[in-house]
Swiss-Prot record:
Catalytically driven reaction(s): 3 malonyl-CoA + acetyl-CoA + NADPH + 3 H(+) = 6-methylsalicylate + 3 CO2 + NADP(+) + 4 CoA + H2O
Annotated active site: 204 (for beta-ketoacyl synthase activity), 339 (for beta-ketoacyl synthase activity), 379 (for beta-ketoacyl synthase activity), 653 (for malonyltransferase activity), 958 (proton acceptor), 1123 (proton donor)
N-terminal hotdog fold as annotated region, ranges: 926-1045
Listed pathway(s): Mycotoxin biosynthesis; patulin biosynthesis
Induction: In the late logarithmic growth phase.
Binding residue positions for NADP(+): 1419-1424
Protein name as catalogued: 6-methylsalicylic acid synthase
Region ranges (Acyltransferase): 186-238
Native source species: Penicillium patulum
Amino acid sequence: MHSAATSTYPSGKTSPAPVGTPGTEYSEYEFSNDVAVVGMACRVAGGNHNPELLWQSLLSQKSAMGEIPPMRWEPYYRRDARNEKFLKNTTSRGYFLDRLEDFDCQFFGISPKEAEQMDPQQRVSLEVASEALEDAGIPAKSLSGSDTAVFWGVNSDDYSKLVLEDLPNVEAWMGIGTAYCGVPNRISYHLNLMGPSTAVDAACASSLVAIHHGVQAIRLGESKVAIVGGVNALCGPGLTRVLDKAGAISSDGSCKSFDDDAHGYARGEGAGALVLKSLHRALLDHDNVLAVIKGSAVCQDGKTNGIMAPNSVAQQLAANNALSAANIDPHTVRYVEAHATSTPLGDPTEISAIASVYGADRPADDPCYIGSIKPNIGHLEAGAGVMGFIKAVLAIQKGVLPPQANLTKLNSRIDWKTAGVKVVQEATPWPESDPIRRAGVCSYGYGGTVSHAVIEEFSPILQPDPLGNGAVSGPGLLLLSGPQEKRLALQAKTLRDWMTAEGKDHNLSDILTTLATRRDHHDYRAALVVDDYRDAEQVLQSLANGVDHTFTTQSRVLGSDISKDVVWVFSGHGAQWPDMGKQLIHNPVFFAAIQPLDELIQAEIGLSPIELLRTGDFESSDRVQILTYVMQIGLSALLQSNGITPQAVIGHSVGEIAASVVAGALSPAEGALIVTRRALLYRQVMGKGGMILVNLPSAETEEILGSRSDLVVAIDSSPSSCVVAGDKELVAETAEALKARGVKTFTVKSDIAFHSPTLNGLVDPLRDVLAETLSPVSPNVKLYSTALADPRGQDLRDVEYWAGNMVNRVRLTSAVKAAVEDGYRLFLEVSTHPVVSHSINETLMDAGMEDFAVIPTLLRKKPTEKHILHSIAQLHCRGAEVNWAAQMPGRWATGVPTTTWMHKPIWRKIETAPLHTGLTHDVEKHTLLGQRIPVPGTDTYVYTTRLDNDTKPFPGSHPLHGTEIVPAAGLINTFLKGTGGQMLQNVVLRVPVAINAPRSVQVVVQQDQVKVVSRLIPSEPSQLDDDASWVTHTTAYWDRKVAGSEDRIDFAAVKSRLVTKLADNFSIDYLDKVGVSAMGFPWAVTEHYRNDKEMLARVDVNPAISGDAPLPWDSSSWAPVLDAATSVGSTIFPTPALRMPAQIERVEVFTSQDPPKISWLYVQEASDSVPTSHVSVVSEAGEVLAKFTAMRFSEIEGTPGVSGSMESLVHQIAWPPATPAEEPLSIETVILVSPDATTRALYAASLPTRVNSFQFSSTQEFFSNASSLPLEKGTVVTYIPGEVASLAEVPAASESFTWNLLELIKFTVNGSLPIKVFTLTANIGEGQTPTALAQSPLYGLARVIASEHPDLGTLIDVEEPVIPLSTMRYIQGADIIRINDGIARTSRFRSLPRNKLLPASEGPRLLPRPEGTYLITGGLGVLGLEVADFLVEKGARRLLLISRRALPPRRTWDQVSEDLQPTIAKIRLLESRGASVHVLPLDITKPDAVEQLTTALDRLSLPSVQGVVHAAGVLDNELVMQTTRDAFNRVLAPKIAGALALHEVFPPKSVDFFVMFSSCGNLVGFTGQASYGSGNAFLDTLATHRARLGDAAVSFQWTSWRGLGMGASTDFINAELESKGITDVTRDEAFAAWQHLAKYDMDHGVVLRSRAFEDGEPIPVSILNDIAVRRVGTVSNTSPAAAGSSDAVPTSGPELKAYLDEKIRGCVAKVLQMTAEDVDSKAALADLGVDSVMTVTLRRQLQLTLKIAVPPTLTWSHPTVSHLAVWFAEKLAK
């Protein structure tokens, strides 16, 4: 066994010490500027995946040139048919990695979904940088948080172009995923490095410049370690074609440096990495110094005869500068690694420069050798410099100059005879005449960057190991690990293969040291106890083959949220066995620990413990007691010498003595005196007593024993067992009696009744013999007592303590429980055989623990030293910290294999197609006509396109049952334009063309028929079925020409029949009522007449465009007017219903001119069995331009809540009675916290006497007294905010109330307290008083708290100051409860109440009048400007826009910055439409805002303000537990102070309307919106307050506006909305909602839609229950799977855990786009690659799968699959 000690063993052997022990200072290097290369890695063409393989390739003069892998250019062949011709003429040969796409994303915790959005250069650089660190022997985790620098050469953006040009599929992660900076930044991010992290683009000089930057960072003290390198990946043909055009590329795809046939370079790919340190630091750290960088330099070649032309003078300058920095004579440099790109101009120029610097004046027989790596591996461009550098380092290390590849004849344009340089043409030993090996490295960029470095060997060599090959001092530990379990076998195989081949000459001790001290220890670990080299090979083979081995441990560390600290448990009597110490007394550490005790004990009783251990003669109880202590002291020393230390200690019986010593409470000598003198006393009672282990809890056993004192429970072992002690015969009788009852008992090997009254007679003698011998102190390690009633008691271990320890019960259960409560989960039983491990296991399981370990130190009759290592191995594999350097202080082996990657191909599948406009349809033409493809040999042709939300061929919104569909007008326009026909017959609209998912669409024209077909585009192209998935949507027959229409409409005659003049918006309102909330096109009716069977409507297809201004779409499109025709045509029927066109007998177009902007629709109801109409499109001159004949409609069954109706969009908040729970909440104690003493007293007086209560005047007073309160299950903290007398006090009071509640929540969550927190408010819902206004933000805050921390508590809005105990107990799971009329109620969204509908005579309330002024706060914000636009559209002519920012003077508007241009443009547009726009710079939240606003209104002299819109707001999302007071107030102020300022300036009834912009986020509990939700809840209550005073005040509780404002749709917001069960709205839908609410006498309107839920999917927030709809069926009342189904859910136990684990892993896998097998149940989801957007998606997936509502913070509080499984199991149990 390894040992840190160097003292002599009893056998006389000594342990080896490494050369360069910690005492060595290396003072001669302390002030050196030298930088050491301590690690190196590479991956280049030819399978050269490490420097050693590369070296062999160099010696063999191999060239890795080959054809480019076909997949690289495949997308370009598909993109455009023309590309094939050009690609055939593009150089396709070069030096390529075999599988560039391979990446081990799981190792780095990156999901496949994110990985495919990462440039392969980032991926390969991550792996190669990791390999370099392993080669350096630097555990990556040891650099976490350090100033380590990363500099990386990179200048290829092929992958970026490939993925970013696929515009429809661009995703958020592609930005950093394809950026140059992403390469070094990704390395820094993964390793958590805080030093410089920079991408270097200096073209082909990039990576040598990166090395230079790394050297400088170390020399300047910026970083202690630098990871430097370069990478190149060739993913596309573009740059290769450029270089072909420039003549830079070799036509045969190979590099021929220095050869006469050199005619261009060949591109190569790969990566190289170096790890750098200062030489002094490297030596202190005992690093393997591969080479020393003496000097480096970078310069630019200035203005040459072309930016890409090489410059010999600049190359000489760089070399001379590097030599100068190194202070080295160029003649001492034996080898120069040249850039040598194989170009006709470049090679001679470079040789000239090298010759001038290194070859000048050299003797012919002493040349400077030169070479270049490029013919071997190609020109890696940005990675070229580092690869040349690596070659130079290898040559220095090996002492051999490798021969040049691809060299047939030296370049005749170079005068080699006088150059003083010589190309290495065969492997050449480094000349022994050189006192030190030195080399130069050149690298140049085609933009003019020139770089050079000078390196040399490091001469001190480590001495050979005195133990010789394969020897090891006793057994040792071989450690392996990986982020996933499956890696362990692979790592074992890799190491075993290496040990039997190239590693066979390495010392096993060095290998073990390397794996323990120079490698990371990941979460999955294997630890193998091995005897020698051969044994190590065999055990590794067993692990690789999945075969168990006695001394092999394999497990995962405890969960990330579980403490890895270790509790040492020293057990008592019963662990002894004869040979337990025979081996150990020969261990120097063990021997040194017990030898002083041996002398003391011999002096006390005349016996030598060491001799007893040698002979095994210690059967008597007195000797067992002494030797138990001695062994535990020796084992403790041995464990500590092997790097294990206790973080807490428990002693059991006699084990309490050693426990006290190890904890520092006693000295070893004091412990020896206690155990020895007590053992002498025990001789008086030996043979008289007995003990049995009873398989019953101690309480039950005591009941059986009764009150007798001669037979007692001596040890409370666990919740299910105890030990009984007493007279020997009585114990035997009791055992028999218990067996008769069916109770199992086991005899304890003891003849003394320890811890029983039979020892009472020994107490005083023990006091006497220990008197004045002990000087106990407080322990320095946490020490739990098993002798005291309180296991955490801090009593000194004095004489009285040991008197009690001898006779009192051993309370092991309580001690272990206390340790568990304090967070400990790892227990090490320090004994010679496990005595209490089983009991500890039982206690842990009884406490509900699942992830824990109880580990024995030794086992009876097992090799002791091996088993001690085995116990350390088990601790290590469960995550305990081990100081491996203490156990393995020797040298380390530099050749041990690095990580074996588990690669999977990851490559973004690009949806490529021709780039010309024919690929996809032109949305502005309102058709689905994409690329036209004729079918050869037929008269059939097909238009093919892709349809999704971004390519919908209409400008508006056209939802049906919550799903966007293409309007019928768009399909008809498609047929007309696609056929060129003027007539369609028998148009059958079969299935709507939905846009809810991407689909391929084809318009097929065949003879006289035309149809639209489509199929969904699957996420994986392999899932595409060529035929089966096509759906036919619409069909028709067509004719190219139609006879011109002679029909004309006599408007006067028609109007004379149409006696009823309708409101202009009749059809819009009709459609709105039946569920059509939005139009696909922006037409409007400006005149409308009807009778029973006819209609005449004047239609403007775009009223926003005035005069002759061009339309915003293709002017030839008939779709807008046809959409008006189909829509108005459906409103002629007397009974409103949701209808859509199903069949049209004939569609005719009678003109070849563009359709007019304004036309008339003449509609006639037809006589038919189904609703049918004829519609003519008529010019203003009365000419019939187009006609629908017999347009038949089918009635669509409306689905409440998901159709496009206003009823599904605008809701009220209703308060139906709450449903009580069956099981009430237990409330035993109520803690009242309120700043208002009177209110607090009133509430307290309402409590029944059976409930304990405590009162505090502030949260701080409560916190100060918390330690003395029963903060346990059954306790509720009730926060009661105070009263407020005036509106002036409201802002400050609101801030105080919300922060007090936040403090209470943080205190509860941070303390993991099982209490509930209730908030009681005073009639907020009525909104009548300043108190209600001040407390109202708590409404919003409470809902967000309930969302982030479910089941923590509830806000109850009460009518009277009475604690609503019944409500608190029985109304569970609600976020807000309102008590009205004594009834507890919870909130639900419901349709607007009909009794609130205003009489038609009153007209809408919330619309402007031309004569008034309309004020908008946040007026220059996106939403503020949209409101301004809407108000102008509805007639407003004077706007006052209030904003914190001012606009520049109008004269400078044409020169404003880009960010202001949209604002200026919008204001100019408003003014062009006749509005007068005034901008007032004013912070409405400031104390003087009222005065400033009033003064400004007087100054401006505008007509009186008739309407106010408060749209100002600030959003700063933070989780409840992370929010700060300042950040919270920053969001609250614009909402509260701003609204109150407006309230004061414009009191109730002084304006026509007072509109406030709130959010639905506080109603559904948007995660992170505690502050925003609080502010909006205030606005909601202020609206109620004003409305009760007779004001037209409304709070709009908006969902997200699509693409606009603070809630603008993003991937995260969309996912959050989806998870809450709601959708966003368009701008038009929002203002349609405004107009709809204007018809009602309401003080609020919730504007959102419920999405359609899957069958059985839980409703995520209960407030949606009444408006939520399902696609199929209704909510299932069963648990996640129907009873009796094949997927029935197990009810409990391991089966349920396995079921949930499988289901949850499946959900995670679906989100991450990986297999379920690759999801580690115990890995943090963040480590698997789950980001913030994916977290929301995962919640939805879990809800769909397990049919249980998931709170937003679940994955934060339960960060692994295992944690989630526990949570779901608890929910299922309920």
